[in-house]
Structures are given as structure tokens and as C-alpha cells.
Regions:
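Active-site-adjacent structural elements in folded domains
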Residues: 144-145, 234, 238, 256-267, ...
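Loop-centered beta-sheet repeat module
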Residues: 247-283, 289
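N-terminal secretory signal peptides that target proteins for export/translocation
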Residues: 1-19
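Extracellular glycan-targeting catalytic surfaces
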Residues: 41-261, 297, 341-342, 351-445
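Long, repeat-rich segments with strong aromatic
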Residues: 277-376
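Generic detector of N-terminal low-structure segments
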Residues: 14-16, 32, 39
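An alpha-helical repeat/solenoid feature that recognizes helix-turn-helix modules
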Residues: 212-219, 272-273, 326-329
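Bacterial N-terminal signal peptides
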Residues: 23-36
Length: 445
């Protein structure tokens, strides 16, 4: 199957059209982005197949929006996406060279971040070495002096812009996404070197740590599918593609062979799960399906260690943010399961030696997607709506409505005040993943 590229001339903005529904449907047929699926029977990636998104579900929701048949939840998610993309249009392109701290290498092209839960020791005159306070975020790790927040922000903007282009057809969004990608990865003056040698450093202990590999997860979960989607845009050049392939190839080598990467590969908690997602997602982009198989097998060994018989995750329950980390670990496992499906490996139904499984882990957490149901463990936060996209993907994979009760009653409201501000981003992401980037049974009715 060949793919069709969207025209580079400005397309219709579905927010402003006031055309008959039937005509709008005909317009859509000529503007839909057609991206082929993987040749699953052969276990081969096909150029253009997404890693974590579904082409058919994206097309379904794009068409429902254009024909004024989308659910109110889908419309809300779409409007929020455009708002985020419009804000991104006004932002300057970001680069690792923007930071004020110079890494030990002497090059600002090397990524640098500070570990969030480490603080100066107030018992020491120089504060060194820093000490760990689990769950308490040091503001010094979240400012522009280092790259941690910058990387998360940059990848979120690229993802929003690329999706906004896909759903609206407006070329300005793709142009900005491409510009941001070139600035971060390609342009010699601003590019990031393909390593995380100085990620999640702790003053007085280490300039960088294996746990810092986690920072790069967004390269897989946000950038990979954006790159695949942008292949359909003629402004994304063959040279762009070649240089991104080279960057990702070098970064994947670093992930697999650096001391930090090897340490993260051996991690038994959520870090190990995210390592598999990161390697597998980038390998998928580079058309290396065997690497995906290897990461699926590696995740099985993680689940064997992580999951108790009833589906709880004792390593994550021991944390001060036990709900967050139980969800966070499970999020990585479900993403890996989605990608493993494309190489004919069923991680959803895989059983650990003690009879547990990814589904049992979801079963264990599902009731707490309702935030009125008290999470019975110590936890500094409980944002249950995060679980909803995971349950949607599980139901799709299982071919049943196992979690429909929880999906239907999901609370996507945002309250006012400080707590509402914290919740807004979580709700926006969960709503998008559930209603715009996926198709629920309610949408198929």
C-alpha cells in the first residue's frame, strides 16, 4: 500500500467551516492522511506505521470531527489540542544549548538535568553531597538552568503541533513542529548530542546516573510517532529524515551500550519498564522489529519481579507517591504491550510465575480511577483519571469491555485553585489519549 501525502497548501480549518455536513464529508475523503499498518503476519515494520498510535482510530476521529459527528469529549480534546498548538506557534524553538549550567564535558550540546528528589544537605556548610527526600521535588531541578523541563516541554509541543496539523490540515502547525525538531536534533549550532550522560545528576554524588535514562522516554512516546506522521508532509525533507535516522541510531546505540543505559536496562522497577519502551519505540522508528521483540521479552522478566499475585506492585507501593508510581510503571508496561502486539507478542495475557499479569495489575488499580475511592496506601497524590487511557487500550487488545464501567464514569473535570492547576495537565492528556487518539466503544455506536 502506498501512502498519500497531504497537500502543502493551506487546507480547511474545521473550526471555521460552516458547510453542509455531506459536503464536508466529501472534503474529508480527499484530505485524510492514509498511513499503512505493519505487516503483522511477517513481523515487519512498514514505513509509515505508527509505534503507539493507531492510523485507523486517528482517521475515525478526524472524520467524525469534520462531519460534526464527534462526541462532546472528542470535540473538547480537539479544541484543547488546537489551543496548545496555537500557544506553541508563539514559542521560540528550544535547544539544550539554552541552559546556563555547562555540563562536565564542557559542551552545552550535552543534555543535563538534576534529579528531582535530591536536596542540599542542610547539615553541611556546602550542602554536599545532596540527600534524597522521596516525593519532595527540588525546584532547582525544574528551572531553565538545566534541560529536564525543557525536554518535556519541547517534546509535548512537537507532539501537539504535529497532531494539530493532522487533524486540522493547517500547514503552519507542521512547519513549526519541523522547525522545532531541526533546532533540537539537527542544526549544528543547537543540536543535542545523542546521549544522556549527565541526566539526573546529584551534586556531590554523580554528574549523571542510570536513572536519568528515564528523561529520554519522550523521544519514544512523543517524538517517534510525530516523525512518522511528518513523513507525510512534503516540508519534511529526505535530508531531515536521514539526519533524524542518524541521530536516533546513535542514541539507540548509547541506550544499549553505555554504562547508564545498561544500568537502566537492569532496573527492576518502573525505570526498567520505561527502558523497554524507549528502546523499542526508537527501534520501531528505525525499522528494527527484532529489537522490539527483545524488549518485549525483557519486559516479561520485569513483570515477573514487579507483580504480586493479586496485581499490586510492591516496589512502587513502597514509594511516598505510591499511586503515581504504580500507575507510571503500568503506563510503560501497557505502551510496551501495544508495540509488542505489532510483532505478534501478547504481553497483555502473559502470566508471571506467581500467576499475575498486566491485566491483573490493571484490575488491581481500576477501582481507584474513581478518585472518590480512597487509595489504601501512603501517597502524596491520587489522580485516578490517568488510568483511563490504559484501560481503553486494554479493552481494545482483549476485545472485550472489561473496564467499561470505569471508563464511562471517568471524571475529566478541572477544579479551580492550586489543585486544579496541577490537575489540568493530567486531565488534558488523559482526555486526549482516550477520546482523540483512540476510539472507545461509545464512539463506535
Amino acid at each position: 500500500m502506498t501512502t498519500q501525502a497531504l497537500p502543502t497548501t493551506k487546507l480547511f480549518d474545521f473550526r471555521t467551516l460552516n458547510l453542509p455536513q455531506a459536503y464536508l464529508g466529501l472534503v474529508l475523503l480527499f484530505t485524510l492522511l492514509i498511513i499503512p499498518f505493519a505487516d503483522a503476519a511477517q513481523g515487519n515494520t512498514v514505513r509509515g506505521d505508527y509505534a503507539f498510535l493507531s492510523a485507523s482510530e486517528l482517521q475515525h476521529n478526524q472524520q467524525s470531527i469534520a462531519q460534526n459527528q464527534a462526541s462532546k469529549e472528542t470535540i473538547r480534546a480537539y479544541q484543547q489540542l488546537l489551543q496548545q498548538a496555537d500557544k506553541a506557534l508563539q514559542r521560540l524553538d528550544q535547544s539544550v544549548t539554552d541552559k546556563s549550567i555547562v555540563p562536565p564535558s564542557g559542551s552545552k550540546h550535552d543534555y543535563l538535568s538534576l534529579s528531582a528528589y535530591w536536596w542540599p544537605d542542610n547539615q553541611k556548610s556546602d550542602g554536599l553531597p545532596w540527600v534524597r527526600k522521596d516525593g519532595q521535588i527540588n525546584p532547582a531541578s525544574k528551572n531553565a538552568d538545566s534541560d529536564g523541563v525543557r525536554l518535556a516541554d519541547f517534546t509535548a509541543q512537537v507532539q501537539a503541533l504535529t497532531l494539530a496539523w493532522y487533524f486540522s490540515g493547517q500547514q503552519q502547525y507542521a512547519d513549526k513542529a519541523i522547525s522545532m525538531i531541526r533546532t533540537w536534533f539537527i542544526n549544528p549550532q543547537t543540536r543535542m548530542n545523542p546521549n544522556l550522560d549527565y541526566a539526573q545528576g546529584v551534586p556531590g554524588i554523580a554528574a549523571g546516573r542510570g536513572t536519568g535514562v528515564l528523561d529520554g522516554r519522550y523521544f519514544a512516546t512523543r517524538i517517534v510517532d510525530s516523525l512518522i506522521m511528518l513523513r507525510q508532509n512534503t516540508r519534511w525533507t529526505a535530508q531531515d529524515e536521514k539526519q533524524m535516522q542518524q541521530w536516533m541510531t546513535e542514541y539507540l546505540h548509547w541506550l544499549q551500550h553505555s554504562p547508564a543505559g545498561k544500568k537502566e536496562a537492569a532496573a527492576q522497577n518502573n525505570h526498567g519498564n520505561w527502558y523497554t519502551v524507549q528502546v523499542a519505540g526508537i527501534a520501531w522508528y528505525l525499522q528494527q522489529p527484532q529489537r522490539v521483540v527483545e524488549m518485549a521479552d525483557l519486559l516479561k522478566t520485569k513483570l515477573d519481579t514487579q507483580l504480586a499475585a493479586e496485581g499490586s506492585q510492591p516496589l512502587e507501593l513502597a514509594r511516598t507517591r505510591s499511586f503515581h508510581y504504580s500507575y507510571f510503571s503500568l503506563q510503560a508496561a501497557t505502551l510496551m504491550a501495544q508495540l509488542a502486539d505489532k510483532v505478534q507478542i501478547d504481553l497483555w495475557r502473559y502470566q508471571t510465575p506467581n500467576g499475575s499479569s498486566l491485566i491483573k495489575a490493571l484490575d488491581f488499580m481500576a477501582p481507584y480511577s474513581d478518585e472518590q475511592t480512597t487509595w489504601p496506601y501512603r501517597s502524596l497524590d491520587h489522580m485516578g483519571v490517568r488510568l483511563v487511557p490504559l484501560m481503553v487500550q486494554a479493552d481494545k487488545a482483549l476485545g472485550e469491555n472489561r473496564y467499561q464501567r470505569w471508563i464511562k464514569q471517568a471524571d475529566f473535570t478541572v477544579i479551580a485553585g492550586k489543585e486544579g492547576a496541577k490537575r489540568k495537565g493530567v486531565v488534558t492528556e488523559a482526555l486526549r489519549d482516550t477520546w482523540l487518539l483512540a476510539v472507545t466503544p461509545q464512539q463506535n455506536k
